[in-house]
Amino acid sequence: MTELVIHLAPHDAFHFLKENPQAVLIDVRSEMEFLFVGHPKEALSIPWRDEPDWEISPEFLARARRATSLNRPVVLICRSGHRSSEAGLFLQANGFSAVYNVTHGFEGDLNDQHCRSSLNGWRFDGLPWEQC
């Protein structure tokens, strides 16, 4: 299968969302990450994998379909861009036609001290976010 998910840097994803108000931003991290680490403003929480087993959520596809339509652009974000890329391929395989992934995710890559949010990512780039 050819990877068709379009990868956008955080700033590019933010501008894409502003220029395409019909697009939906879905945060695929766990509910706890979404609530306690923070999330992009206006993101919907639809976990791809969640506690306690970190298995693919059997409700993911149905929840994504309820949140948007197959033809609307969907922008996915996770912690570092890996889970969202995987979820994007799954959505495409299930009929979604315009799927985008935020590279580096919300928290970004690990630095030399194994800390996130210090090299790249949505939060590092100073894009709008909130914490519950």
Q: What function would you assign to each model-found segment?
A:
Residues 1-23, 31-73, 84-132:
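Rhodanese-like catalytic fold shared by cysteine-dependent sulfurtransferases
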Residues 27, 81:
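Conserved G/P- and acidic residue-centered "switch" motifs that form tight phosphate/ATP-binding loops
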Residues 76-77:
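Short, surface-exposed ligand- or partner-binding patches at beta-edge/loop junctions that are enriched
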